Swiss-Prot record:
GO terms for cellular component: cytoplasm. Its EC number is 3.1.3.5. One of its GO terms (molecular function) is 3'-nucleotidase activity. Its cofactor is a divalent metal cation. It catalyses: a ribonucleoside 5'-phosphate + H2O = a ribonucleoside + phosphate. This is 5'-nucleotidase SurE. It comes from Acidovorax ebreus (strain TPSY). The keyword Transmembrane does not apply.
Length: 260
């Protein structure tokens, strides 16, 4: 089994080091990750400036770009082979609910999925890397289980996994979940630069809004490892009928080519 590993915290982050060390015992692994922290970069690609790939002393390759850049470059020429699995993380903090829209960790895994490769995004629920070895061990266990069920290397799928910061033996079983929801982000933070200019920092993520049973928020709060299958299609299928009727009322029959 060949695995490509990336992340959004940067190639030196404890999460990706722990994940690499855990997975190298069961597979051929290669790391291609951002040079610096690229959190909240989602699926962004760098199109208007050159990207450079360098190799660290431990063999990790790092790119002056986004998480999606790293996976894209790896899969379109850098590796020279097609991996069986793309794994992203382990992220320093949760990627639950609305976080998945912004997450560079999820973005890296989604890039693998877009190239037709099964992909998993791993995150720890709390920041600070507490119990990171436990999280890496759980990630390895999940990958092994997927491989044993012949799911690795087959039709593409995308999973978002959040692991509580707990000792391995204290973690409760995997729980299949839907995404919860957060409240809107906190108010922007205003500061004054040394030159007297007003500058802004994006506020923190909002608290959980929908943390009902069945959500990733609920599962991890009760010690479970949450697993959520994701998809790329953003179509609002429930709203298609409503909007078809609404748009039909907005567009004159002649413009739509219909005969009155």
């Amino acid at each position: 089994m060949k695995i490509l590993i990336s992340n959004d915290d940067g190639y030196q982050a404890p999460g990706i080091v722990a994940l690499h060390d855990a997975l190298k015992t069961i597979a051929d692994v290669e790391v291609v990750a951002p040079e610096h922290n690229n959190s909240a970069k989602s699926n962004a690609l760098t199109l208007h400036s050159p990207l450079y790939v360098q190799t660290a002393h431990n063999g990790f390759r790092y790119v002056n770009g986004t998480p999606a850049d790293c996976v894209h470059i790896a899969l379109t020429g850098l590796l020279g082979y097609r991996p069986d699995l793309v794994v992203s993380g382990i992220n320093n903090g949760a990627n639950m609910g609305d976080d998945t829209i912004y997450s560079g960790t999820v973005g890296a895994a989604m890039e693998g999925y877009l190239f037709g490769i099964p992909s998993i995004a791993f995150s720890q629920v709390d920041k600070g890397w507490g119990e990171i070895e436990s999280a890496a061990r759980k990630a390895r266990e999940i990958v092994q289980q997927m491989d044993r069920q012949n799911l690795v290397g087959e039709a593409p799928w995308l999973l978002n996994v959040n692991i509580p910061n707990m000792p391995y033996d204290a973690l409760r079983p995997l729980r299949m979940c839907r995404l919860g929801r957060r409240h809107a982000a906190e108010r922007v933070i205003e500061q004054q630069s040394p030159r007297g200019e007003l500058m802004y920092w994006i506020g923190g993520a909002g608290a959980a809004k929908d943390a009902a049973e069945g959500t990733d928020f609920h599962a991890t709060a009760h010690g479970h490892v949450s697993v959520t299958p994701l998809k790329v299609d953003l179509t609002d299928y429930d709203g298609l009928g409503y909007w078809a009727q609404t748009v039909a009322r907005l567009v004159p029959a002649q413009a739509s080519g219909e005969v009155a």
